[in-house]
């Protein structure tokens, strides 16, 4: 099983790339985290936010592994504890499907994409920079894995 984080946005600051890379490299080979950056659609006077999100949806879908479980990050998504994420990670590893976490662009994710996602989750009730969400999600995936392994990284 591979974990894919598909994120709309590119040209992140070095500290974002470094933070993401730190947690991604800690993951074991059978549960690697891969980042797929999706170039955002340029907003202009002729393109509404809805049009841009629909165009980004097509780019996201093209970048995802076939048959992957789709977990969309959204402000209205379900709150998960680290332990709950660890339980989901265990289930996902058992069924063997790849899992794709989707981070939308400046306007979020297309409504149709969210409707078709297997699950909506949120990282925080607060608004966060999209680059930081990459780092936080990678850290939480590593934490979830460490919980499943009784690794001392996660302390209760």
Curated annotation (Swiss-Prot):
S-adenosyl-L-methionine binds at residues 73, 104, 123-128. One of its GO terms (cellular component) is cytoplasm. Its main location: cytoplasm. The keyword S-adenosyl-L-methionine applies. It is found in: Cytoplasm. The keyword Methyltransferase applies. SUPFAM superfamilies: alpha/beta knot. Keywords: Cytoplasm, Methyltransferase, rRNA processing, S-adenosyl-L-methionine, Transferase. It catalyses: pseudouridine(1915) in 23S rRNA + S-adenosyl-L-methionine = N(3)-methylpseudouridine(1915) in 23S rRNA + S-adenosyl-L-homocysteine + H(+). Its EC number is 2.1.1.177. One of its GO terms (molecular function) is rRNA (pseudouridine-N3-)-methyltransferase activity. Specifically methylates the pseudouridine at position 1915 (m3Psi1915) in 23S rRNA. Homodimer. Belongs to the RNA methyltransferase RlmH family. This is Ribosomal RNA large subunit methyltransferase H.
């Amino acid at each position: 099983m591979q974990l894919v984080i598909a994120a709309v946005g590119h040209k992140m600051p070095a500290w974002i790339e470094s933070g993401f890379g730190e947690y991604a490299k800690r993951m074991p080979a059978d549960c690697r985290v891969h980042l797929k950056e999706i170039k955002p659609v340029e907003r202009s006077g002729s393109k509404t936010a809805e049009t841009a999100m629909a165009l980004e949806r097509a780019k996201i879908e093209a970048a995802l592994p076939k048959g992957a479980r789709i977990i969309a990050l959204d402000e209205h998504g379900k709150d998960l504890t680290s332990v709950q994420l660890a339980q989901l990670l265990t289930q996902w590893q058992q069924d063997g499907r790849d899992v794709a976490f989707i981070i939308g662009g400046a306007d979020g994710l297309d409504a149709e994409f969210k409707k078709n996602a297997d699950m909506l989750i949120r990282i925080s009730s607060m608004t966060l920079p999209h680059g930081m969400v990459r780092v936080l999600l990678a850290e939480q995936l590593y934490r979830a894995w460490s919980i499943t392994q009784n690794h001392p990284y996660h302390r209760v």
